[in-house]
Each structure stands twice: as C-alpha cells, then as structure tokens.
Amino acid sequence: MKKILALMGAVLLLSVSARAVEVSAPSAVLMEKETGTVLFAKNEHEKLEPASVTKIMTLLLTMEAIDGGTLRYEDTVTASPHACSMGGSQIWLKEGERLTVDEMLKAVCVVSANDCAVALAEHLAGSEEAFVERMNRRAAELGMNDTTFKNACGLPAEGHVTSAYDIAL
C-alpha cells in the first residue's frame, strides 16, 4: 500500500503541463546545431535590420582570409577617410592611422567598432562595396536567403536585412 501511495504521489508531483513558449522578440528561432532541425520558430523569415550582427559576417570573412593565408594577424591596416567617417560605436580611428589586423579584430569584437569593421573590409577587398559583394556571396553560399548586406558594420541602410532563421544558420 505504501508503494502505491508513493507512486501516486510521485506521479502527481511530476505531472507538469506544457505551455507555449512566450517570446517578446518580433522573431526568433531555436535550431538544433547538428541537424539544423528547427525546435521553435516565431516569424523566423521576417526581414529585420541586423545592426551589429552584420559584423559576424565581416569577422567570418576576415577569419577565412587568415585561415586561407591571404591575411595575417600582424598585417597592418590603414584607416581611410571613409572608415573614419562611420558613426555609432567606434574607437575613433584617425585618417591614416595604422593598426594590426589583430588589434582591429579585437576592436570589432570588444567595442563593436564600426570604423575598424570598415577598415578591415577595405583592406581585404579594396573598398567596402567590393567587400559587401563578398559578404552577400558568402551569405548565399551559407543558404542565408533572407539576407542582403549593404555595409560591413551594420549601420542602418535601406535593404540591409536578415532574418532570425538566417542568423541561426
């Protein structure tokens, strides 16, 4: 009798009702890493401004260049007038100022430095516009069908969009 009561008590205590997940964000995705299975989605393909999440693609292309041997951490990057004109978060590079790739990467990662993101982009591709073409090409290769980049740092620009789904990829 005690075993039956204990079992019934355990069942009562362990019974939990599932309720819907409430997410206040306009869109969200929870994706299993190995299989890509979507476990939760809310407006996952809604196109939104990516802001500084853009810098993840800038960092990816920079790291791929390092891995590919076309760029080294010790290489020097010179700040152009265009890179120095960025608004938002920055380290206030001065025109002609030179930092190593390593220093620029740290500034992008720690400070979210727009000026350094653009300086790296220009260093790698000759211009921010040419680098953005690379960003969009790489996004397409990754299957990021909701994403269009317009700049290397994430400052607002018409048509500069991505989705929660694409970010999850």
Language-model features, listed with the residues they occupy:
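Acidic, His- and aromatic-enriched active-site or binding-groove loops in soluble protein domains
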Residues: 168
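Active-site-adjacent loops and short helices of periplasmic peptidoglycan-processing enzymes
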Residues: 18-165
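Bacterial N-terminal signal peptides
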Residues: 7-15
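Positively charged n-region of N-terminal signal peptides that target proteins for export
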Residues: 1-4
